[in-house]
From Swiss-Prot:
Keywords: Amino-acid biosynthesis, ATP-binding, Cytoplasm, Glycosyltransferase, Histidine biosynthesis, Nucleotide-binding, Transferase. PROSITE patterns: ATP_P_PHORIBOSYLTR. It comes from Streptococcus mutans serotype c (strain ATCC 700610 / UA159). Heteromultimer composed of HisG and HisZ subunits. The keyword Iron-sulfur does not apply. Catalyzes the condensation of ATP and 5-phosphoribose 1-diphosphate to form N'-(5'-phosphoribosyl)-ATP (PR-ATP). Has a crucial role in the pathway because the rate of histidine biosynthesis seems to be controlled primarily by regulation of HisG enzymatic activity. This is ATP phosphoribosyltransferase. The keyword Nucleotide-binding applies. Belongs to the ATP phosphoribosyltransferase family. Short subfamily. It catalyses: 1-(5-phospho-beta-D-ribosyl)-ATP + diphosphate = 5-phospho-alpha-D-ribose 1-diphosphate + ATP. Gene3D superfamilies: Periplasmic binding protein-like II (3.40.190.10).
Length: 215
């Protein structure tokens, strides 16, 4: 008997791109078209169940075996690095981690900098690799105002188009790393569900063609 696969993903852009990818793989995803306020969806043939959750919670659902598969940005995985297997770079949801600040910021200044961010692990690791001792200020909301009001010398944040930075008088000084959506899986599920391995191989063949993945 075929076992159902549960997939946890973030509502919004990643969800939409994941649905498109599954459609290209030949799966009927029409049941996801009219979601309303629902957060749990099951395919008509019962082969898939989808959970729409907040991005940081995707790893939690996969880690505890509630979901067999998770689709989430690499930014989340860097901050929550354990308890799952990272299987595939899905080649969508592309953006980057960058250091940004007001135009008078000097990245070569060796004074102890204050860095505001929602991603303390990313920021700390980046500056440690540069041999710089920095003070990390964790902020949960919009970080763009931190350099403007003097709370921090610079910020580490996700940059896609850069429009939000420009609108707040900031510019990018350093790029840290590329970010994209990744597929993660539960370790026990990979061992106990042959359907999961077959699904991963199917996705791997599809995302290997970047033109197909981005079309």
């Amino acid at each position: 008997m075929t076992k159902q696969l549960t997939i946890a993903l973030t509502k919004g852009r990643i969800e939409k791109d994941t649905v498109k990818l599954l459609e290209r793989a030949g799966f009927d995803m029409s049941f996801m078209a009219d979601k309303g306020r629902n957060l749990i969806f099951e395919s008509p043939d019962k082969s898939f169940r989808f959970l729409l959750v907040k991005a940081p919670d995707v790893t939690t659902y996969v880690r505890h075996g509630v979901a067999d598969i998770g689709v989430v940005g690499k930014d989340v995985l860097i901050e929550h690095p354990t308890g799952y297997l990272e299987m595939l770079d899905l080649n969508f949801g592309l953006c980057k981690f960058s250091v940004a600040s007001t135009p008078d910021y000097n990245p070569s200044d060796h004074k102890r900098k204050r860095i505001a961010t929602k991603y303390p692990t990313v920021a700390r690791d980046f500056f440690n690799q540069k041999g710089e001792d920095v003070e990390i200020i964790s902020i949960q909301g919009s970080v763009e105002i931190a350099p403007v009001i003097g709370l921090a010398d610079a910020i580490v944040d996700i940059v896609e188009t850069g429009n939000t930075l420009v609108a707040n008088g900031l510019e990018v000084f350093e790029d840290i790393c590329r970010i994209s959506a990744r597929m993660i899986v539960n370790k026990a599920s990979l061992k106990n569900k042959p359907e999961l391995l077959a699904f991963i191989k199917k996705m791997e063949n599809l995302v290997g063609d970047r033109e197909v993945a981005f079309k």
